[in-house]
Amino acid sequence: MPNQHMEELNDQQIVRREKMAALAEQGIDPFGKRFERTATSGQLKEKYADKTKEELHEINETATIAGRLMTKRGKGKVGFAHIQDRDGQIQIYVRKDAVGEENYEIFKKADLGDFLGVEGEVMRTDMGELSIKATHITHLSKALRPLPEKFHGLSDIETIYRKRYLDLISNRESFDRFVTRSKIISEIRRYLDAQGFLEVETPVLHNEAGGAAAKPFITHHNAQNIDMVLRIALELHLKRLIVGGMERVYEIGRIFRNEGMDATHNPEFTMIEVYQAYADFHDIMDLTEGIIQHAAKAVKGDGPVNYQGTEIKINEPFKRIHMVDAIKEITGVDFWQDMTFEEAVALANEKHVPVEKHYTEVGQIINAFFEEFVEETLTQPTFVYGHPVAVSPLAKKNPEDPRFTDRFELFIMTKEYGNAYSELNDPIDQLSRFEAQAAAKELGDDEATGIDYDYVEALEYGMPPTGGLGIGIDRLCMLLTDTTTIRDVLLFPTMK
């Protein structure tokens, strides 16, 4: 079968391959070998930021850099170029009489996109730009394809997501955003590690989807001839570790949900879940606030965070309000009073709140009211707590009012950023809630989970009172990088 890739070479690609062959003929490996640099562009700019042209000439310091050739100009015996490394770009100044004829030819024949190593004197041009006056140039790797025309800022959205490497080369803003993402995750780890939490890894392949209400991806294990699912949450395995005595655990991992895609949803995404023995949801509220404020401070500094023109007071204590009070504040409807399911449905109809066919409890109506009227008002960081039992199958009932649970969700800019509760550690209650979920599944609720008997058995060995938390890392990264779509914080988002 002919190689279609080879048949489609355009003129530029042919010329680049010819140059590759010419390098090989000269005894130069077109794809280079190990190269030792002494500094990055950023380190040089930082080190010599306050040095004038004259001072640099007097110091006469040399440096060796390496990176991708991004611009090149000049003719005859003198040339200027920009080399790009992980910190950004730095100019190089190449003179034929300084590097020698053979070495100057390597520079002259280099194409944009090629990798070069440059050794030379640190200087400042008459225009004040910090540069390297080359004394030697090393060819490090040949680029066989030219960079996209607009390499100063790739603008084609499809290419940005499909060929992230081109986006990273051409869009510094995008590159920096992903560096920030990594920093956010590192800071969260540092914060939890300092408080005695242990980072663990749990299985991605599960026998039964659990720990969340979501449709799973189903796969098949050939050797055991069993269907398995990709995890939709981290929860149930982490709580088994609390049973095992680990007391403080967390996991940062990929989650898979076979659901729709939009600006804030991708089929695979990153979550952190944290579990702390002997804590309740009030302690976990404090922990959540600490995690988010610590991450924000690390990448944004002290003070509020600006998101799409709105000032988010992330540095101040987060508001805390019961779900029923929040609904009452906005709609005037009081769900504190006892009511039948029929009365709740009548209220929903009166207020034009959709009632799904699988609803059988007042709690589901309360949650629907919250989603319909309250969520869109929650701009500043707000902990909404006291979710109904009907929508919280893994959370502990509130001892004062068992219709509700000791659970909270964190909302910022109308979106949910975290979900947490005092964990249900009563195996009998847990089994009955699993059974209710299984019944809802039978009634057509696609997101209801099945029964995890192994988890119930684990609880029967005893689990201490525990607080647990889940935070969507991608949404947090969107907030802290002022980004409107999840695809801009995922290096390789899911594409058709």
Swiss-Prot record:
Gene Ontology biological-process entries: lysyl-tRNA aminoacylation
Gene3D superfamilies: Bira Bifunctional Protein, Domain 2, Nucleic acid-binding proteins
Reactions the enzyme catalyzes: tRNA(Lys) + L-lysine + ATP = L-lysyl-tRNA(Lys) + AMP + diphosphate
EC number(s) on file: 6.1.1.6
Cofactor binding annotation: Binds 3 Mg(2+) ions per subunit.
Binding residue positions for Mg(2+) 2: 416
Coiled coil ranges: none
Cellular compartments annotated: Cytoplasm
Name of the top EC class for this enzyme: ligase
Cellular component terms (Gene Ontology): cytosol
UniProt GO MF annotations: ATP binding; catalytic activity, acting on a protein; lysine-tRNA ligase activity; magnesium ion binding; transferase activity; tRNA binding
Protein biosynthesis found in the keyword field: yes
Subunit text: Homodimer.
HAMAP family per record: Lys_tRNA_synth_class2
Record protein name field: Lysine--tRNA ligase
Gene expressing this chain: lysS
